[in-house]
Amino acid sequence: MKTIFLSLFICILFLSCEKSSVSEGSAYSEAVYSVEFTGKWKAPEFGVPSGVHFTTILGMIHNSQTYQWKEGELASWGVERIAESGNTGPMVIEIDSIVALGKAISYVVINAPTPTGSNKTNIYCNSNYPYISFETMLAPTPDWFTGISSFNLYA
C-alpha cells in the first residue's frame, strides 16, 4: 500500500493509492490502484469562503516523455483553463493529442468532492506508462489549482 499526503496552497488534500493487483512479466507489469481524493478545506484548519469547491479532477497515465504541467514552466492552454475557470475541455484535447503520440494511455477523471468530502476511483497503469498527473481548480480563487505532476507509481 502506498499513501501520499499532499499539502498544497490553502487546503490539504489526501490522496491515497493502494495497489490492488499486479501482474508481472519479465519486462512488463500492470497495476490497478484505488485512488481516493479527500478535500480537507474546513475550519479550524482553514477558513472556508462562501462558494468554495473543487472542479473535476482531470489527468492522465503517461510515460516519462511527457507531463501535464511542470512547476516553473509556463502553463499550457488546458492547464490555464482549469486553473482560471475550471473548464476541462482544452485539457481533454491536449490529453487526446498526447495519447495519439503514444506518450499516455488513459485519462484520470475523478468527480469533484465537496470541500470536506472524498471521491474514489480505480486507475490502471503499467511499467511502460508508470506516471500519474492530474489537476483540479480550487474555487473561488483567481487561478489556484492543485494536483500531482508526473508521480511515478512504480518507484
Briefly describe each language-model feature range.
Residues 142-155:
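An exposed acidic His-Trp-rich patch
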Residues 15-31:
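Bacterial Sec-dependent N-terminal signal peptides
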Residues 2, 22, 117-119:
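Sparse, context-dependent recognition of short Cys/His-centered cofactor- or disulfide-binding micro-motifs
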Residues 4-14:
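Sec-dependent N-terminal signal peptides
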Residues 1-4, 18:
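Positively charged n-region of N-terminal signal peptides that target proteins for export
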Residues 26-32, 41-145:
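Structured domain cores in non-transmembrane regions
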